[in-house]
From Swiss-Prot:
It comes from Pyrococcus furiosus (strain ATCC 43587 / DSM 3638 / JCM 8422 / Vc1). The keyword Transit peptide does not apply. Binds 1 zinc ion per subunit. Part of the 50S ribosomal subunit. Forms a cluster with proteins L3 and L14. CDD domains: Ribosomal_L24e_L24. Belongs to the eukaryotic ribosomal protein eL24 family. Its cofactor is Zn(2+). The gene is rpl24e. One of its GO terms (cellular component) is ribosome. This is Large ribosomal subunit protein eL24. Coiled coil: none annotated.
Length: 66
């Protein structure tokens, strides 16, 4: 069975054959589950400031749950 990918921006797992794989010039591979995640990454948006990302939820737990 194929391995599920995890979005490099929002942290959501998604099925193989969906999403997009982006390879940077330095060889780092980024996976995006949606066009929304891809756009936000290239616009430089911080995933820790967006409530729908896993990074936000993890940062919130570290701060004490506010």
């Amino acid at each position: 069975m194929a391995r599920w990918n995890v979005c490099s921006y929002c942290g959501k797992p998604f099925e193989p054959g969906t999403g997009k794989m982006y390879v940077r010039n330095d060889g780092r591979v980024l996976f995006f589950c949606s066009r929304k995640c891809e756009r936000y990454y290239f616009m430089g948006r911080n995933p820790r400031k967006l409530k729908w990302t896993k990074a936000y939820q993890e940062a919130r737990l570290q701060r004490g749950g506010e």
